[in-house]
Amino acid sequence: MSSFPWLTILVVLPIFAGSLIFFLPHRGNKIVRWYTMSICLLEFLLMTYAFCYHFQLEDPLIQLKEDSKWIDVFNFHWRLGIDGLSLGSILLTGFMTTLATLAAWPVTRNSRLFYFLMLAMYSGQIGLFSSRDLLLFFIMWELELIPVYLLLSMWGGKRRLYSATKFILYTAGGSIFFLIGVLGMGLYGSNEPRLDLERLINQSYPATLEILFYFGFLIAYAVKLPIIPLHTWLPDTHGEAHYSTCMLLAGILLKMGAYGLIRINMELLPHAHYLFSPWLVIIGAMQIIYAASTSLGQRNFKKRIAYSSVSHMGFIIIGIGSITNIGLNGAILQILSHGFIGATLFFLAGTACDRMRLVYLEELGGVSIPMPKIFTMFSSFSMASLALPGMSGFVAELVVFFGLITSPKFLLMPKMLITFVMAIGMILTPIYLLSMLRQMFYGYKLFHVPNENFEDSGPRELFLLICIFLPVIGIGIYPDFVLSLSVDRVEALLSNYYPK
C-alpha cells in the first residue's frame, strides 16, 4: 500500500493549476487551451498510473486511504479513499473532462474563466467520488453548483439565465435536505460530530429516524439523477448550455446522484433502503415509460435527447432498488455506459446546432447530404443509446433486467409487471431516436441556407468521437473489463448489510 497522497494530488491539482490560468500571458486563446488540455491529460495519466500500480482489484476494502486533520475545532478530517464502486466513476470523470475540454476548443469569449470553471468542476467531481467523510462529501457535492451555474449563465443560449436559475434553485433546494441529513447522522448519539464513513457504516438508528435520513438524502439525489418529478430542470439546462458543459452534465453530474444513492443510502442506511427499494423499482419503471413518451413529443432535438437521459436513468434506479449483485453491477455499468453515450449525443447535437442554427425537428431534413460524418456518428451513438447488441447500452440494460428477475425481494407477479413496463420503455426508445434521425438527416432539404455554412466534422471532432466510440464498443463486447472493477465490492456490500 502506497503512503504517497495520490488522491489529494488528484483532487487539488485541477483547481490549483486552473487558478494559474489567469496569470498566463495574454497571447490569444491558444495558450489557454493547450495549458488546460495539458492539465487534464496530466491528471488522467496520474490517476491511471496510481490505479494500475497501487490499487488491488481483488481487495473489496477501501484503498489509497488518506486521513488528515483539517479543522480541529470541529474534529473535521480530510478523509479520502477509493474502492470498486468509485474507481469506474473517477476514471469516467478523467476521460470525459479531458474530451469535454477538447470539445470546448471553439469557446473564445472569456476563455480563461471558462476553462478555470471546467477544472474547478473536475476537482469537485474527483473529490466527491473519493471522499470518505460525510461532510467532505457534502462540500464536494456543493462545489459543483457555482461552476455549473456560471457555465450555464455565461455561455448558454437565449434562455440561459432562466435555465441557470432553475438549476441552482432545484439543486440548492435538494442540498438543504442533504445538509440536514449530514448533520443529523454526524451528531446522532454524540456531542462531537462523527463523520467518518467507516464508523457510520456500523452505526444503527431507530427505524423512524433512519427512514427520515434516507428520505432526506433521496430528495437531494433525486434532483441530480434526476428522478421524476424533480427532473424538469434537466431539459431546460441541456437545451441552453454549451455542448461541452452538456457533456459534463450528462456524463458525470447526473452520475453523482446515482453514486450518492449507492454510497450513502445503500451503505449507511441498509434497513431503510430495504423498505424503500420496491418504491425505487416502481419509480424507475415509471420513469422509463414517462420520459420516453415525453421525449417522443419534443420538437427541440436537444430536449428530446435530454428526456432520453431521464429515461435511461430509470434503469440505474431499478438496478439499485433490486438489491442483487447482478442488478447493482448492472446499475454501475449503466452509469458508465450512459456517461459515454449521453455525453456524446449532446456533443453531436451541439455541433450540429452550431452549424445549422436550427433546433426544431420540423425545420430540418436532408442534413446527411452536407454532413455525412456527423450523420454517421449520430446514427452510431443513437444505436448505442437504443441498446443495440454489441454496444454498452445493451449489456447494461440486460444485466439490470436479470438483476430484477433474480431478486428474491420481489414476488413473481410484480417482477413480471415491472419487466413488462421496462420492455415497453425499450420499445419506445428506438421510436423516438429513429424518428429524430429520420426528421434530421433523411428526406428533402427543408432549410434554405447556403451549403457553405454546413461544414462536416473536422479532425478534432472525429478524434473525440472515436475516442468515446471505442469504449462503447469495448464494453459491449467484453463487459467483464468494467464489471471486474466493482463485482467484489458489490458482493461485500450486499452480503454485509442486507437482510437475506
Swiss-Prot record:
Cellular component GO terms held in the UniProt record: chloroplast thylakoid membrane; plastid
Originating organism: Oryza sativa subsp. japonica
Superkingdom of this protein's organism: Eukaryota
UniProt cross-references to InterPro entries, sorted A to Z: NADH_Q_OxRdtase_chain4 (IPR022997), NADH_Q_OxRdtase_chainM/4 (IPR010227), NADH_UbQ_OxRdtase (IPR003918), ND/Mrp_TM (IPR001750)
Keyword Amino-acid biosynthesis (UniProt): no
Keywords: Chloroplast, Membrane, NAD, NADP, Plastid, Plastoquinone, Quinone, Thylakoid, Translocase, Transmembrane, Transmembrane helix
Listed name of the protein: NAD(P)H-quinone oxidoreductase chain 4, chloroplastic
Any GO molecular function: NADH dehydrogenase (ubiquinone) activity
Keyword Plastid tagged: yes
EC number, UniProt record: 7.1.1.-
UniProt similarity note: Belongs to the complex I subunit 4 family.
EC class name: translocase
Localization terms from the record: Plastid, Chloroplast thylakoid membrane
Bilayer disposition of the protein: Multi-pass membrane protein
Catalytic activity line of the entry: a plastoquinone + NADH + (n+1) H(+)(in) = a plastoquinol + NAD(+) + n H(+)(out); a plastoquinone + NADPH + (n+1) H(+)(in) = a plastoquinol + NADP(+) + n H(+)(out)
Chief localisation class: plastid
BP GO terms, sorted: aerobic respiration; ATP synthesis coupled electron transport; electron transport coupled proton transport
Residues that span the membrane, as ranges: 4-24, 37-57, 87-107, 113-130, 134-154, 167-187, 211-231, 242-262, 272-292, 313-333, 334-354, 386-406, 417-437, 462-482
